[in-house]
Amino acid sequence: MWYDYRFRAYPDRTGATAKAERHINIHRQAYNHTRYEYQELDTNNHKVGSAYQHQNRLTEWKDEWSMFSEVHSKALQKTVEQFYNNLSNLSEKKENGHKVGWLKWKSPREYQSMTYSQSGFELKNTSGQTATLWLSTIGDIPIQYHRDIPDNAVIKEVTLKKETTGEWYVTFGLEIEDTELPEKPEANIMNAEDCVGIDLGIQNYVYTSDGDSVDWLDLSDEYERLRREQQSLSRKKRGSNNWERQRKKVAKVKRRMKRKVEDFQHKLSTWLVKKYDAVFVENLNVSGMLQSNGNARNKQDAAWRGFIKMLEYKGDLYGTHIVQVNPRGTTKECAECGVETDKPLWVREHSCPSCGFEADRDLNASYNVLSRSLRELGLGQTESTPAETATAVDPSHRESVPASRVIETGSLGA
């Protein structure tokens, strides 16, 4: 299993900032040159076309441009690999029907990180709140060591990044052997009552098959602050000192919004994997959910992919099954009898014309997610439907949990 730990870094305390910035710029030029050669050189000559082939050209680069000899060789190979990873992601999006262009040339502002892989780094002095990260060709960088890296984790990669706010961060890519992880309960001995289906929606952030719902995180104050700061930025001359100071203010507001969303997602996902043996979620087409104009503003707030990834890696850490199921028809299909009924987005209640079953539309969808996932895990289906076995819930009297409560308490409880 692979996951990340992130720490604040302070290269300025050891005079390493200038060298780190120069090295990142060299990596940026390496990325852009990889892109250039991929477009210009014939892939049939076996010089380019794969990360391995292209990495073999680095010796020629170093002979022609001495700056490439300044940076660590493994880190330079990782930069070439990053281009091909981005290329692969682009191809995957195209295969899935998304409209994609070509990988863009990276400007200095767009490329602000570098990654050491396998070697060229060492974490030292980890006994206190401040540790030291040594990077080959750069030197020592103090980091705010606010949590210990687990003893059973192996550091495979180290990424040094300068944020748009001017702050530096270090991310450790950690690997834990699967044998070190807690065992997930076997499907044939799991109790369906210890499983939950969740619907990721627009009206509520999540709605569980147990009848719990969590409101969207309220970012209205942050959006208003961002609007004011961006308006102030637009009045300043681009590139001036005042413009740069205001740009950092805008970046800090965005960073605060991002952290607030991530904190909410972390606490909600942790609560789910601790409470249940299995969490079932729709494999949503996020762009489809949020493509309408009325929902466009929620795109950066939702970050559904990030939330589902949190569930997946925390499921491994806590021994919880995370299963994604086909979302087709979960809202239309009646959880009681299976008859499908079309509903526009503004209709928030499910009322089946066939059997008369009524529920909140998101609650009905979560029942269907639960039912499909139980079948996928091979648990079979009880004589009763999820709608019949679930705790009786009157949607008109069920209070949705504010996102602020999740942040404050780390749970859906009071």
Regions found by a protein language model. Name each.
Residues 34, 79-90, 363-373:
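Stable alpha-helical structural segments in soluble proteins, enriched in small hydrophobic residues
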Residues 88-100, 177-184, 317-323, 342:
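Active-site phosphate-binding and catalytic loops of NTP-dependent enzymes
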Residues 298, 302-414:
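Positively charged, low-complexity nucleic-acid-binding target-recognition regions
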